[in-house]
């Protein structure tokens, strides 16, 4: 079961703490439809201005000032921008996300022990 892509780029981009819907690759999913049951939380890395300039030149993209600031100060995964549906953001609790990131995983990159989100709050901005 999939849901249609809702890619709103560059308004929503892959800065640290964003929730995005997982999906299969472009070859088998050119519409970029999202999984209805799987998601990921962006952790990523910090980027320098030179690294972002290089990405722009090599990939023919342009980062907004907001994106540049976020990728340099917060980190993220800019190579995923415009390719996945982003639907939320962690506004507090990134320490818990960091723990999840470093959890032991199996050969399929799934946690050896299930991880459950016991509580969350939806905040409208």
Regions found by a protein language model. Give the residues of each.
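Cross-family detector of peptidyl-prolyl cis-trans isomerase
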Residues: 1-125
């Amino acid at each position: 079961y999939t849901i249609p892509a809702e890619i709103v780029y560059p308004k929503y981009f892959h800065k640290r703490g964003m929730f995005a819907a997982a999906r299969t690759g472009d070859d088998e999913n050119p519409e970029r439809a999202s999984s209805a049951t799987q998601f990921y939380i962006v952790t990523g890395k910090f980027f320098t201005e030179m690294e972002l300039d290089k990405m722009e030149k090599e990939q023919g993209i342009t980062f907004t000032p907001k994106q540049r600031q976020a990728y340099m100060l917060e980190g993220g995964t800019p190579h995923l921008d415009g390719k996945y549906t982003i639907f939320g953001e962690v506004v507090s609790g990134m320490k818990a996300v960091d723990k999840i990131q470093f959890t032991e995983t199996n050969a399929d990159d799934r946690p050896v022990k299930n991880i459950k989100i016991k509580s969350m709050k939806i905040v409208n901005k």
